Amino acid sequence: MEESRIENYLKRRVEKLGGKAYKWAPVGVVGVPDRMVLLPGGKVIFVELKAPGKKARKLQEYRAKQLKDLGFRVECFDNIEKIDKLVSNIEIAD
């Protein structure tokens, strides 16, 4: 499965929860996660998407750590099963 299909799947699942999964590409900053997921209740999750079996690059790991240090949740998904698990956990928590 291509990364773009995983990304589209994430977007659809988040929208079914009543949220938004915006493409996130701040000007002049490289290595940030692909999507900023905004959920009802003010929840924010930054998501890096990868093709199956691929890992985040060093700079992407660094940016993820920066966001985590600020208190944000950051996830990296390389398959739809991980997205389904996230959505299930969100539904259970609500």
Question: Where are the regions that the model predicts?
Answer:
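Catalytic phosphate/metal-binding cores of nucleic-acid and nucleotide-processing enzymes, i.e., regions
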Residues: 1-94
